Design a protein with these regions (language model features):
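A glycine-rich helix N-cap at a beta->alpha junction
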Residues: 86-96, 161-175, 368-380
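Active-site nucleophile and cofactor-binding loops and adjacent substrate-binding regions
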Residues: 40-48, 68-72, 100-119, 142-146, ...
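N-terminal amphipathic, basic-rich helices that act as targeting or association modules
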Residues: 1-79, 204, 215
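Cofactor-binding active-site loop characterized by glycine-rich and histidine/acidic residues
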Residues: 41-162, 298, 303, 312-313
């Protein structure tokens, strides 16, 4: 096997064209084996094998710097830059992350996981090179829908003005995670259909040189193209037409489903661990489709992640014009939601917690200043969510709970969530966000009669004395377990409180606790600093009430073990009760 002898790009350069083609097959075989056992980004990597080989054949990494947008397609790059063992041998599968990582290799220049940043980052590297009067190529690799992100367009806009070497490889597989959206992709389609000759050319209009590679999965053609632009003295776009998922039939035929995969059976493609029950995604789509039929003003919005809201392809078709995918453009999604609300519509924007930060300004400026009554549903904002450092969902409580006018809610069950969502859509006074719990969805069948328009009214679910436990969202059930453990240890029944609201405190209830409680415990699923518990502690700051805040310490975690993280932050029932020293 050639791949076993590849310890760096210098070894790639030793191979003939035929050998490079065999190397591509070996890379795909290794990827198929690893991803079937380990999971990861499938389609993006299978489509970029030949381009990655060609880049490392032509350029001189790490002197020539390659920046992968999102970097979810960087697996072949890692295999060719000294990290092949992490893809060839199961005992080493966890040696590398799923994204570029400077801590792993000098061939990686940034830790990247969010979209549309590569061109701007590459511009910075190119400018630094020129300031130091050095030589070398800087290559930005962007695709999978990332061009629709505002930062990518901003980077393209400035690239022609840079005045030095910059190579932008546009990996055009006609897909985002799902299908692409927006006029930009119509232009890419026109360029594909005319072999790059269309008179309407976005890149040339921005002052960039341009070449087109029709066979973006053909090593020889890619090598020729990259040799043509190597050491260019200006900014140039190399537009390559690739096939997402190339080399695995199921991924070629079902590109959306195979963007990312869990462990699966290679022969059938079926996941090894199937889940047939409800989750918050499927429940969201089911509810919204029903609501859409009842009210034509209801509209669901996504920024290129439709399945997080449960809107798989058939449900998107069912929703029709009442479903909007703006592409990878969170800022536009949020501002558009604010505009729809201002115009009398009822928008619901579903977004991963980790991507909320990409639209923070729009939430503050466009949504909340005028109190436009849009609904935001944040998914996977939890220690039980994604655990890569680039995709943590632990910051949304401090970020969103401190924006004036925003009502941020934290349900603990399916029933509470749907009641909150229904109230939020039908009311027209407040911008509302709903933080979905992490872990498995709990459904207790209870009918929710709470009036959420009475803001910041907590609910005492178990009345006791001495110790009060306020469990927010995901950690409400842990709060119930803590209360039970307190009673078992002391014989005194503890009070349990479901706060519902993240953005405000129930001063009446908290004041009442002073009468017969000495200790208040808060539990929250996210960073402690600037979070929910600190608001409670601040309220009791001038009193004798002892307050224990539990959550996650603010730090950039990467690929953490959930149980270890909980123990590290004293987020276990035994540790919490022990801290009380009862």
């Amino acid at each position: 096997m050639y791949i076993e002898n590849i310890n760096g790009p210098e070894d790639v350069k030793k191979l003939s064209e035929d050998q490079l083609n065999v190397l591509a097959e070996e890379i795909r075989d290794a990827l198929l084996k690893k991803l079937s056992k380990h999971g990861g980004h499938f389609g993006p990597n299978f489509g970029m094998v030949e381009a990655t080989i060609a880049m490392h054949y032509v350029f001189e990494s790490p002197k020539d710097k390659i920046v992968y947008d999102v970097s979810h397609q960087s697996y072949p790059h890692k295999m060719l830059t000294g990290r092949k063992d992490a893809f060839l041998y199961e005992e080493h599968y966890d040696d590398v992350s799923g994204y570029s990582n400077p801590g792993e290799s000098e061939h990686d220049h940034f830790t990247i996981g969010h979209t549309s940043t590569s061109i701007s980052l590459a511009l910075g590297l190119a400018k630094a090179r020129d300031l130091k009067e050095e030589n070398g190529n800087v290559i930005a690799v962007i695709g999978d829908g990332s061009l629709s992100g505002g930062e990518a367009l901003e980077g393209l806009d400035y690239a022609a003005e840079l005045g030095g070497n910059l190579i932008i490889v546009v990996n055009d597989n006609d897909m985002s995670i799902a299908e692409n959206h927006g006029g930009l992709y119509e232009n890419l389609k026109a360029l594909r259909e005319t072999n790059g000759e269309s008179k309407c050319n976005l890149f040339k209009a921005m002052g960039l040189d341009y070449i087109y590679v029709k066979e973006g999965n053909k090593v020889a053609d890619l090598i020729e193209a990259f040799k043509q632009v190597k050491d260019t003295k200006k900014a140039v776009v190399v537009h390559i037409n690739t096939q997402k998922g190339k080399g695995y039939k199921l991924a070629e035929e079902h590109k959306e489903e195979w963007h990312y995969c869990a462990p699966f059976d290679v022969e059938t493609g079926n996941p090894l661990d199937s889940f047939d029950g409800e989750d918050f995604s499927s429940v969201t789509a089911q509810y919204l489709l029903k609501k859409m039929k009842e009210d034509k003003k209801v509209v669901a919005i996504t920024s290129a992640t439709p399945t997080v809201m449960g809107f798989i392809e058939d449900k998107r078709k069912e929703a029709g014009k009442q479903f909007i995918d703006v592409g990878i453009a969170e800022e536009t999604a949020m501002a558009m939601a604010a505009g729809i609300a201002a115009g009398g519509g009822k928008p619901v924007y579903g977004v991963y917690s980790t991507f909320v930060q990409r639209t923070y300004d729009q939430i503050t400026q466009d949504l909340c200043i005028d109190s436009n009554a849009a609904t935001i549903v944040t998914f996977w904002g939890s220690v039980y969510g994604m655990n890569d450092v680039t995709h943590l969902g632990l910051q949304d409580i401090p970020m969103m709970s401190n924006i004036p006018n925003l009502v941020y809610l934290a349900p603990t069950t399916k029933e509470e969530y749907l009641a909150m969502l229904d109230w939020s859509i039908d009311q027209d006074q407040y911008p509302v966000a709903i933080k979905l719990p992490g872990g498995e969805m709990i459904s207790d069948g209870k009918k929710i009669t709470k009036d959420f328009s009475q803001l910041n009214k907590y609910e005492v679910t178990e009345k006791g004395s001495k110790v009060a436990v306020i469990g927010l969202g995901t950690f409400y059930n842990m709060g119930c377990e803590v209360a039970k453990a307190v009673e078992e240890k002391t014989g005194t029944k503890a009070t349990v409180i479901n706060p519902y609201y993240i953005t405000g405190i129930d001063e009446v209830l908290l004041e009442d606790l002073k009468k017969d409680h000495d200790v208040v415990i808060t539990l929250e699923d996210g960073f402690l600093e600037g979070g929910f518990g600190e608001k409670i502690a601040r309220f009791y700051g001038d009193s004798d009430m002892k307050v224990f805040n539990y959550g996650v310490k603010k730090e950039l975690l990467d690929r953490y073990d959930i149980e270890e993280l909980l123990k590290k932050n004293h987020l276990t029932v035994q540790q919490i009760v022990g801290d009380l020293k009862l």
